[in-house]
């Protein structure tokens, strides 16, 4: 088995049909991708092969995610909750997305939100704010809006974008020297925003940055 020798599937609490809910979560940005079901056999197959397998309640059979669509899922980590009756799979999603509709996530229908920005489309539900920001900026680069500051920077090009990064970095340094925590947070946010604009202009994905950070995890940090 590919999992910890200290773990036994018998620790898990399957329902009266022998199933347990499994939530698939993007291993890099934390976005919730889908909810499916597993039985002991599909869980064992997943742990042994690292290719995620679920139990189809409609077809009453095990199915390897993406076997026909190509949208496969590779297991990075798996956890169970405090009641031992639910799983979270940290996975690498391949293909067009986790949802059969072609969306990245199955959870694209919003009921309510306390977000201050009611117009921004959330392409990665429940993901971290930096990934959501990058998705919004990337969308802006594809579908420009009149008077958009982001589109202004992208139109002006490298020199303007890099100049802004330099200015914001200098302001961040001054905020640190002044020990002004509110300004430090504000200027750090400005740097992240302008860095992401530069990445988009250069055709570099935010996930590329996350992949580099992930590769450095635990290396003499």
UniProtKB/Swiss-Prot annotation:
Keyword Cytoplasm among record annotations: yes
Swiss-Prot/TrEMBL keywords: Amino-acid biosynthesis, ATP-binding, Cytoplasm, Histidine biosynthesis, Hydrolase, Multifunctional enzyme, Nucleotide-binding
Localization (cell): Cytoplasm
Record's GO cellular component terms: cytoplasm
EC number: 3.5.4.19, 3.6.1.31
Stretch forming the signal peptide: none
Entry keyword Lipid metabolism: no
Family from the record: In the N-terminal section; belongs to the PRA-CH family. In the C-terminal section; belongs to the PRA-PH family.
Name assigned to this protein: Histidine biosynthesis bifunctional protein HisIE
Organism of this sequence: Prochlorococcus marinus subsp. pastoris (strain CCMP1986 / NIES-2087 / MED4)
This protein's encoding gene: hisI
């Amino acid at each position: 088995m590919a999992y910890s020798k200290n773990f036994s599937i018998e620790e898990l609490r399957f329902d009266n049909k022998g199933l347990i809910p499994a939530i698939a979560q993007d291993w890099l940005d934390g976005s919730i991708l889908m909810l499916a079901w597993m039985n002991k056999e599909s869980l064992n197959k997943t742990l042994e092969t690292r290719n995620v397998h679920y139990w189809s309640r409609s077809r009453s059979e095990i199915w390897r995610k993406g076997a026909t669509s190509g949208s496969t899922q590779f297991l990075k980590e798996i956890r169970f909750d405090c009641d031992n009756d639910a799983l979270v799979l940290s996975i690498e999603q391949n293909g067009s997305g986790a949802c059969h509709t072609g969306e990245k996530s199955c959870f694209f229908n919003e009921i309510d939100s306390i977000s201050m920005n009611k117009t921004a489309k959330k392409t990665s539900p429940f993901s971290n704010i930096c990934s959501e920001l990058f998705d919004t900026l990337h969308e802006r680069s594809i579908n420009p809006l009149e008077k958009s500051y982001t589109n202004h920077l992208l139109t002006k090009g490298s020199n303007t974008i890099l100049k802004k990064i330099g200015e914001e970095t200098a302001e961040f340094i001054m905020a640190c020297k002044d020990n002004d925590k509110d300004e430090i947070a504000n200027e750090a946010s400005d740097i992240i925003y302008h860095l992401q604009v530069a990445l988009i202009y250069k055709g570099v994905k935010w996930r590329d940055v996350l992949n580099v950070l992930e590769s450095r995890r635990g290396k003499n940090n």
